[in-house]
């Protein structure tokens, strides 16, 4: 029997290794636990990270993973098959990874997911990470009062675009600061302030 996409959530809250149990069954052995022994511990949330652009109707994106750094820490798990430098082609499903977090309560799990998203560094292709963070911070999701029409009801691309612009402004200011410290402030300031600058606001 195949595993469900959300099996890491089950593994986090039960402490079981479902793949190991499958292998035991394939070998003709019994499960290593009984129904009575199953206990649920805490809350887990899974986010499907895809190479799709949430600011452009979630259209699939292609390109090279220029940056690919997974978040680390207790209660954080990343199931993936990609490494930095690999190509995201047009031929397959745009799924990059599954990001799963576990904490004592749902509220803490949401906070941990936000931190994990912030620590998950991907550049070269657009991803659904910003949308995932938007959901984790939204009052409807936090309260549990939502349904499958969440995007239709609450989400507009502009909500992410404004955040991306602010992040890029901060990145540009940090770059100027580094250049100033290296003695190239004049060149950097001129490039940023120039009306016909070659800089384009795009994904990093």
Predicted regions: what they are:
Residues 4-204:
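Catalytic cores of soluble metabolic enzymes centered on carboxylation/carboxyl-transfer
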């Amino acid at each position: 029997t195949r595993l469900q996409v959300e099996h890491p959530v089950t593994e986090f809250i039960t402490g079981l290794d479902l793949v190991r149990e499958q292998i035991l069954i394939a070998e003709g052995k019994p499960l290593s636990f009984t129904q009575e022994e199953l206990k649920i511990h805490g809350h887990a949330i899974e986010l499907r990270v895809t190479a799709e652009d949430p600011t452009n109707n979630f259209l699939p994106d292609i390109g090279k993973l220029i940056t690919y750094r997974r978040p680390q820490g207790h209660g954080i798990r990343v199931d993936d098959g990609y490494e930095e430098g690999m190509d995201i082609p047009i031929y397959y499903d745009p799924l990059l990874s599954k990001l799963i977090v576990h904490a004592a309560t749902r509220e803490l799990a949401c906070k941990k997911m936000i931190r994990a998203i912030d620590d998950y560094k991907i550049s070269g292709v657009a991803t659904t990470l910003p949308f995932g963070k938007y959901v984790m911070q939204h009052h409807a999701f936090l309260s549990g009062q939502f349904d499958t029409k969440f995007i239709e009801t609450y989400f507009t691309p502009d909500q992410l675009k404004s955040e991306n612009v602010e992040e890029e402004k901060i990145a540009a200011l940090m770059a100027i600061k580094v250049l100033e410290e290296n003695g190239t402030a004049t060149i950097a300031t001129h490039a940023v302030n120039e009306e016909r600058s070659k800089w384009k606001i795009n994904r990093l």
